[in-house]
């Protein structure tokens, strides 16, 4: 029997999603006759010899976002999925756009990377300078996002300068600012890629919120990708060095897909529900 070890953080903010994902993985492992052992990040002592680590497998499905821990596991010779560099680039929305900017064929939402130390409310003149820069780059509405955040959290729609100033004044973490894509109309496409193959695509739409996240009340239905769209998703996953991921696209004015963001530790439960298949089966089968 093949073994895979999974590492997760029990203090994960969205407890329900974490538990559902765990059950999905357990069911997938059972159907594939794989021994999947779960460990919390607290089970790993980085101050001990690697021979004393609790894993029966050299392959770690890393469900945490602790980049330092992932890098340490790699340093002792373990295969970590996703890799520390891939998690870092995907988890940081500013880095994601910087990495993909090296690939001009990947169309992205117009994005402005904000200053790293974001306490502009303490410096009114600098805050006004940044607002003027945003106004030169974009037309209202604009989207303000913390560079870290999942499930649609820390994402703000600013319809005018007053709302933008209010939003920026209350933030202390680095952000990105993006043009609001009105043609997408609270809808998006989530593409799941595993080991350079698209294993599922979902069209999502939210009637009650500008965010199209399933965790924010959006509903989903299967989406048929064209060959060009499939190639685009795989190109993004390869550029980000991600073994598996969820890529979110919006629709531009021509109804072509435009990159929004990528998720390294993608939650598979709701996508599996709408696609009527356990996506974790493809994930574990590709890892084993």
From Swiss-Prot:
GO molecular function, one term: ATP binding
SUPFAM superfamilies: Glutathione synthetase ATP-binding domain-like
Binding site residues for Mn(2+) 2: 261, 263
GO cellular component terms attached to this protein's record: cytoplasm
PROSITE patterns: ATP_GRASP (PS50975)
One of the protein's GO biological processes: protein modification process
Residue sites binding Mg(2+) 1 per the record: 248, 261
InterPro entries: ATP-grasp, ATP-grasp_RimK-type, ATP_grasp_subdomain_1, Rp_bS6_RimK/Lys_biosynth_LsyX
Pfam families xrefs: RimK (PF08443)
Annotated binding of Mn(2+) 1, by residue: 248, 261
Ligand binding (Mg(2+) 2): 261, 263
Residues of the ATP-grasp domain: 107-288
Keyword Manganese (UniProt): yes
UniProt: ATP binding residues: 145, 178-188
Domain of life: Bacteria
Keyword annotations of the record: ATP-binding, Magnesium, Manganese, Metal-binding, Nucleotide-binding
NCBIfam families listed in its UniProt record: rimK_fam
Entry similarity comment: Belongs to the RimK family.
Protein name (Swiss-Prot/TrEMBL): Uncharacterized protein MG012 homolog
Lineage, opening ranks: Bacteria, Bacillati, Mycoplasmatota, Mycoplasmoidales, Mycoplasmoidaceae
């Amino acid at each position: 029997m093949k073994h895979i070890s999974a590492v997760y953080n029990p203090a994960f903010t969205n407890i329900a999603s974490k538990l559902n994902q765990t059950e999905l993985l357990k069911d997938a492992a059972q159907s594939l006759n794989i021994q999947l052992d779960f460990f919390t990040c607290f089970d790993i002592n980085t101050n001990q010899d690697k021979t004393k680590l609790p894993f029966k497998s050299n392959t770690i499905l890393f469900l945490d976002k602790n980049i330092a821990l992932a890098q340490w596991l790699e340093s002792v010779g373990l295969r970590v999925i996703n890799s520390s560099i891939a998690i870092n680039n995907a988890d940081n929305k500013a880095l994601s756009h910087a990495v993909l900017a090296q690939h001009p064929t990947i169309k992205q939402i117009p994005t402005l990377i904000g200053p790293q130390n974001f306490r502009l409310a303490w410096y009114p003149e600098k805050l006004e300078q940044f607002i003027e820069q945003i106004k030169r780059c974009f037309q209202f509405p604009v989207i303000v996002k913390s560079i870290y955040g999942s499930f649609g959290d820390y994402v703000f729609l600013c319809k005018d300068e007053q709302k933008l100033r209010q939003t920026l004044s209350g933030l202390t973490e680095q952000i990105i600012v993006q043009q609001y894509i009105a043609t997408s109309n609270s809808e998006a496409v989530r593409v799941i890629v595993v080991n350079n193959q698209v294993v599922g695509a979902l069209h999502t739409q939210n009637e009650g919120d500008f965010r199209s996240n399933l965790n924010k009340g959006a509903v989903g239905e299967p989406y048929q990708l064209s060959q060009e769209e499939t190639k685009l998703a795989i190109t993004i996953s390869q550029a980000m060095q991600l073994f598996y991921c969820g890529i979110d696209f919006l629709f531009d004015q021509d109804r072509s897909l435009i990159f929004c963001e990528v998720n390294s530790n993608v939650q598979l439960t709701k996508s599996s529900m709408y696609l009527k298949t356990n996506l974790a089966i493809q994930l574990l089968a590709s890892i084993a």
